[in-house]
Design a protein with these regions (language model features):
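Active-site-flanking beta-strand signature of metal-NTP-handling nucleotidyl enzymes
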Residues: 3-8
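Absolute protein N-terminus
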Residues: 1-2, 103
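Active-site acidic-Proline motif in GNAT/NAT acetyltransferases
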Residues: 11-12, 69
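An amphipathic, aromatic/His-enriched active-site/gating alpha helix that lines ligand/cofactor pockets
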Residues: 24-36, 55-98
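Short glycine-biased active-site loop of nucleotidyltransferases that positions the nucleotide triphosphate
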Residues: 49-54
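Carbohydrate-binding/catalytic loop surfaces
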Residues: 44-47
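Short, conserved charged micro-motifs
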Residues: 13-18
Length: 103
């Protein structure tokens, strides 16, 4: 099982546009072979100690894939790459953690 936590920081004032761009591809990504979960999240001010600082511009994509090959197929898909190039100007920063289950 592969988990992905992709933190995307939108340019100031462009978070909603970025969210809408991701919502547009949700059905296609969720239909891909090996995709078990693909969802959008935003920061929640919880007041809990240890939480990362709140940033209203961050959109986090939470993904679950059956294996690394399925994730690679998604990332290397030409339609996804074309879409990503179109939304890249909305992004100030992006980082991705790729995790594997150990239990």
């Amino acid at each position: 099982m592969i988990y992905v936590m992709a933190a995307i920081t939108a340019n100031d004032g462009q978070r909603e546009e970025l969210i809408e761009a991701f919502r547009a591809i949700l059905p296609a990504v969720r239909a891909k072979a090996g995709c078990l979960e693909y969802g959008l999240s935003i920061h929640l001010e919880s007041g809990l100690e240890g939480q990362a600082p709140y940033n209203e511009n961050v959109v986090t994509i939470v993904e679950k894939w059956v294996d690394l090959d399925a994730l690679k197929a998604h990332i290397n898909d030409h339609q996804y790459q074309d879409w990503f190039e179109q939304v890249w100007p909305l992004m100030a920063d992006a980082s991705m953690q790729i995790l594997t289950a150990i239990d």
